[in-house]
Amino acid sequence: MQCMLGTPSHAKSYPFPVPGRSYIFRNGKVEDLSPDGFDRAGRTPVLAAGSNQSHEQLTRKYSVLEGHVEIPVQRGKLGGFDSVYAAHLAGYGSVPSTFYPSPKTQVTTYVLWLDDAQLNRMHETERNYTYDRLENIQVVIDGEEVLTTAYAYTAVV
């Protein structure tokens, strides 16, 4: 596992900037998501709480992969959960967040559509979390589509 130590200012800037819209993360760059969508075959929907929503964090995590890296990232609203502080420190010194059940709450999140290599890399960077399948959820993507099953990394709170 690669350690992602940073400066105190890096830790304090958590959860890092997000584009505020759905996008394609392509080799460290943010690009517009095609109106025609993308091919979901072979991809797993993973909800991002905290820094995994940020293209800056995705760049840090995925720069170790060889070849072309392309991750569709969709902005959505997750119902019945909130994003709260986790009970541990990240490797770079910030207090990260995790999803926690919260009826009547809606939180903005991003859905990362990861292929197998990207998912394996994400597992390597999320060792303080459990990888959970969330069923019967409601993620309204870009105000239209509803996703009812996805995965998330959950931490002790």
What are the roles of these predicted feature ranges?
Residues 1-157:
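Glycine-aromatic micro-motifs
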